[in-house]
A protein has these predicted regions:
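A glycine-rich beta-strand to alpha-helix segment
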Residues: 131-162
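A short, gly/pro- and small-residue-rich
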Residues: 111-119, 157-167
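Short glycine-rich anion-binding loops that position phosphate/pyrophosphate groups of nucleotides
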Residues: 44, 71-73, 100-102, 149-152
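Short hydrophobic segments within beta-strands
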Residues: 68, 97, 146-147
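Nucleotide phosphate-binding/pyrophosphate-handling subdomain across enzymes
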Residues: 1-93
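C-terminal helical cap/extension that packs against the catalytic core
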Residues: 85-142
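Short glycine-/acidic-enriched loop or helix-start segments at secondary-structure transitions
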Residues: 78, 105-106, 154-158
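A structural signal for short coil/turn segments at secondary-structure junctions
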Residues: 24, 60, 119, 139-140, ...
Length: 167
């Protein structure tokens, strides 16, 4: 409507919409091949994770869904651990990375294990960031989702290269 009001050519509008690739780190496809899918998302709250995981499972109902989540902030992890555990259990397999502290100092007793212990699922683990690529390489990850507001996105290039070789 605004474009029409501003008298922008309709062909230019259609071309711009067709070329729009979405927002970075919101259900962003990093790898999309027949055998492997890697999606990255900034989700760092249980409701964002719920939308992400439900959407992915709806799009790919026949693929095993593995989520790699990096909790963001000790206070958020402490306050929302139950919600994170409930929502992460939507995935078939859960990998937690250590908490990204951002501006916070550690809080005694608050860690990714706090969430892990509340997840009602056997296929779950905590890995260090340095272990993730090798773990993915040695496991069958059909639909891999990385999520978090920390620095988890720094692993994407290595994950992408490894998955592309794995085809």
């Amino acid at each position: 409507a605004i474009a029409g009001y501003l008298k922008i050519d309709e062909a230019k509008i259609k071309k711009a919409i067709a070329g729009f690739k979405g927002v970075k780190r919101r259900f962003e496809y990093i790898v999309k091949s027949g055998s492997h899918i890697l999606i990255d998302d900034y989700a760092h709250h249980p409701e964002e994770l719920r939308a992400l995981l439900n959407g992915a499972k709806e799009l790919y109902p026949n693929k095993k869904c593995t989520v790699v989540f990096q909790p963001h902030l000790y206070t958020r992890t402490r306050d929302l651990a139950d919600g994170f555990a409930e929502v992460l259990a939507i995935a078939d397999e859960v990998v937690l990375l250590p908490i990204y502290p951002a501006r916070e100092l550690p809080i005694e007793g608050v860690s990714s294990e706090m969430i892990l212990n509340k997840i009602n699922k056997s296929s779950k683990r905590v890995l260090q960031k340095t272990e993730l690529v090798d773990w993915v390489k040695s496991n069958n990850t059909e639909l891999l989702i990385t999520a978090g507001a920390g620095d988890i996105d720094l692993l994407l290039n290595d994950l992408k290269l490894m998955l592309e070789k794995k085809r």
